[in-house]
Amino acid sequence: MGKRLGALTKDNTKCMIKVNGVTLIDRLLIQLSSLQLSRVVIVVGYKGDKLREYIGNRYPDLHIQYVYNTVYNKTNNIYSLYLAKEYFVEDDTLLIESDLIFDDALFHKIVDNSYPNLALVAKYETWMDGTMVRLDEDD
């Protein structure tokens, strides 16, 4: 359903796009594998069964659970987050969008951080659209 990516997402989800020969979801799951997490919860919608089949048993060191957003074409990321809410009250949570690329060291910095809550945001650029965060001197 990634409309802006056109043909690249006609038959796949955005996270299955390859960058430098590696799908975004593979890159992310490899990074998460190094963190020794108790579980990874993936909310799937568009082409969700195809993504689940693709991931299969590739990551035996990750306990992967899936939540299905059956109304993905009418909802957004917030609704997907709502669908997975039961998992967030059980454990510490890393909320990650699977169509983004992160430096490997970033995840270790987050997990090893002493703050009880932490949000990472990109510096605003004029080309950006979507949700924005404004910080003041207290943040």
For each feature predicted by the language model, list its residue ranges.
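Short catalytic helix/loop segments, enriched in acidic residues and glycine
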Residues: 10-27
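Short amphipathic alpha-helical segments
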Residues: 9-10, 30, 53-56, 106-109
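Conserved core of the sugar-phosphate nucleotidyltransferase
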Residues: 103-139
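N-terminal nucleotide-binding beta1-loop-alpha1 segment
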Residues: 1-10
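Short beta-strand/turn micro-motifs composed of small residues
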Residues: 44, 97, 121
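Short beta-strand-to-loop acidic/aromatic patch adjacent to the donor-nucleotide binding site
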Residues: 91-101
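Conserved N-terminal catalytic core of the sugar/cofactor nucleotidyltransferase
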Residues: 22-93
